[in-house]
Amino acid sequence: PLAQYDLKGSDYVTLCDYSAIPVTISGDYDVTDQDVLDYVEKIFTQGGPFYTADPDKTTVEEGDIVNVDYVGKLDGEAFSGGTAEDQNIDVSNNSSTSGSGYIDGFTDGLIGASVGDVIDSNVTFPDEYPNNPDLAGKEVVFTFTVNSIQKEVTMDTMDDEFASKQFGADSVDGVYKQVRQYLESSAESTHKNDVYSALEDYLLENCTVDMPADYRSDVIEAIRANFIDRYCSGDESQMETVLSSYGYTEESIEQEWSDSVESSIRLELIVKAIAEKEDIQIDDTEFEDYVSTIVSSGGFGDADTLYSNYGYGDYVYGKNQIRVIYLAGLVLDKLAETAEITENAVEETTESVESTESADSTEE
C-alpha cells in the first residue's frame, strides 16, 4: 500500500542553500483606478442587463420589462413549478430577461395592465410538454401581480438603492470599493502564487534527491489503476481506446505520469527535509480547518472522500499527501520571508504597440 511511503525527507535529500533564494517574477500586481472601472463595466456588460423599478411608468406597453409575481393553477389548485416571485418579464418576447422562453400566450394579459393590478390570464399548455407531462394540453390560469415596470440600469445610472439591492454595498462608491478589494486580493494571490512557484522551481533545480524507486513506481501503478477504474469501467482492455479519445497513447500518458510523479515526489521530500531542519510543525487544529475548507470548496462531501481521492483509493496515503501539501505552504511561507524577489513589469507585446501606433495614425 502507498501508506507505507511516509518517508523522512532528510534520508533522501541534500539541501541547497535556501537562506536567500533569488526569485524573479513577471506580472502586473498593481490595481489602478482604470482597472476598477474596467471591471465594473465588465460586470454590467457580461452580467447584465440589470433592471430597477421605473417610477415614471405605470401602464404596461409593448417592449416593456415588467416585474411580477405569479401563481399558476390547474382546476383551482396551484401546480408544481407554476409559482414565482420578483420575476422580470420581457412582454414583447414572451420570455424572462435571462432569455428563458414561456409557453405561448403567457404574457399576453400583461399588456395594458397597471402597476399594482392583479390579473388572471388563461393559458393552454402545448400538447407535448416534457417538462411536466401532467400539464400537456391542459388549460390553466396564471394570476399575475404587477409589481413594477422596469428600466435598465447601467454603471453610469446606478444609484445607492440599486447598489445595495444588487451588490449588497452601502452605496455606489461601496460597489467600486468592493471591486477594488477583490482585484487587490486577486493580485496579491497571483503575486504569492508566482513567488511560491518560483521557489519550488529553485528547490527542484538546486536540491539533490535520491529518488526512492519503489515509491515512484508504486504511485505510477496506483495512478494507472485509478485511471482504468474511473475512465475504463475497470476494463484494462478499453484503455487504448479511451486514451486515444484524449489524444494519448499508453506510452505518452505513462511518460507524462512518470514525469509528474517524479517531480511531485522530489518536491515532497525536499519540503519534508526543510521542515525537519527548521522544525516546522503542523498544528492539527489549523490543519483540520484547512481540510474543511478544501472539502467545502472542492465539493468532496467529507474528509474521507478527499483523502481517498488524493490517495488513489488509499485513505491513509491520501491524508498524508494533504498534510504534505499543507506543510509545503508552511515551508514556502518561511522561504518567502527571506527570498530576494525581483519583480519585472509586464512588457507590452509588439502587436499591441503596433496596434496603438496604427490607431494613432488614423486620427486627425
Predicted regions and their residues:
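FKBP-type peptidyl-prolyl cis-trans isomerases
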Residues: P1-E364
